[in-house]
Regions:
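Short, well-ordered beta-strand segments
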Residues: 53-55
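Catalytic core of pol beta-like nucleotidyltransferases
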Residues: 1-37, 42-48, 57-105
Length: 105
């Protein structure tokens, strides 16, 4: 699968419109981590105003987490994006979401 097909598959899997997906990719691209989506948008249970839950398996260094949240808030993305700090997640939570993770970047 080429890069364009991969992007289309991810875009469809997380149930957001094309413009929001491009904004999300651009914001996440500023950070050296792999990001995964999980939750209602991945499970096909999203409603019109559902947020997008994002998780990084890697611990985010320094102020990267807060800067990422600010970058998302300052962007033109039309949905709320909830970024989870992996260092604050319990092992039970990680186990609960691991089957649903869809790599975004």
């Amino acid at each position: 699968m080429d890069n364009m097909d991969t992007n289309k598959a991810i875009h469809k899997a997380i149930e957001i419109d094309t413009e929001d997906y491009e904004i999300l990719k651009n914001v996440l691209g500023k950070y050296p981590y792999k990001f995964y989506a999980y939750g209602s948008r991945v499970k096909g249970k999203a409603r019109r105003y559902s947020d997008l839950d994002i998780y990084s398996v890697e611990k985010m260094e320094g102020n990267d987490l807060i800067n990422l949240k600010w970058d998302l808030e300052d962007s033109d993305i039309t949905i709320k994006v909830d970024v989870i700090d992996p260092s604050r997640c319990s092992e039970e939570f990680r186990e609960l979401i691991k089957e649903d993770l869809v790599e975004i970047k």
